[in-house]
Amino acid sequence: MLENPLIQQVLFEIMDEDVVGFDVLSVLINTNEVTDDEISRQLDVKLNNIRRILYKLYEARLVDYNREKDEETNWYTYTWKPSLEKVPALVAKKMKNVLNGLKEQLNVEENNMFFFCSDCEIKFTFEDAMDSGFRCPQCGEMMYEYDNKKDISLLKEQIKYLEDEFNKNPLFSTY
């Protein structure tokens, strides 16, 4: 399941783009139950970094933990275990959010006229361009009508790709 690029992307975002998170997940999957200290030693990564990743995964409900108190030291030991059955639903939710955002952007692109400042490389809606007298508010240069056919085409390709991935991937058949 972790080999799926869509799942990897969502996990990467959950872990704040920290690639060590995949190593943490691998340790959890391979051992099924392990302390944060053991993960830290096994990966030779600072304990604080391991805990930060585990907390992010816990917030997404992708790991669970048990807490036990050492009667001699009064310290707590946290034993972590993977809870990856929620991954497909999480990825499906993220994909739907991305798809909705792309569809909204496509709607904006298809139903508006745009102008462009070639110096600043900023795109403006017709209304914004008109409000500034068709001069760039950043640099004062004249704006030109922007042909957004390529943008529309790219958005349609991205939407089709995500919809195809979503429909053909057996992980998401129930979502």
From Swiss-Prot:
The keyword Lyase does not apply. Keywords: DNA-binding, Transcription, Transcription regulation. GO terms for molecular function: DNA binding. It comes from the Archaea. Residues 3-88 form the HTH TFE/IIEalpha-type domain. It holds the Pfam family TFIIE_alpha. The keyword Amino-acid biosynthesis does not apply. GO terms for biological process: regulation of DNA-templated transcription; transcription initiation at RNA polymerase II promoter. Monomer. Interaction with RNA polymerase subunits RpoF and RpoE is necessary for Tfe stimulatory transcription activity. Able to interact with Tbp and RNA polymerase in the absence of DNA promoter. Interacts both with the preinitiation and elongation complexes. The winged helix domain is involved in binding to DNA in the preinitiation complex. Belongs to the TFE family. Transcription factor that plays a role in the activation of archaeal genes transcribed by RNA polymerase. Facilitates transcription initiation by enhancing TATA-box recognition by TATA-box-binding protein (Tbp), and transcription factor B (Tfb) and RNA polymerase recruitment. Not absolutely required for transcription in vitro, but particularly important in cases where Tbp or Tfb function is not optimal. It dynamically alters the nucleic acid-binding properties of RNA polymerases by stabilizing the initiation complex and destabilizing elongation complexes. This is Transcription factor E. It comes from Methanococcus maripaludis (strain DSM 14266 / JCM 13030 / NBRC 101832 / S2 / LL). The gene is tfe.
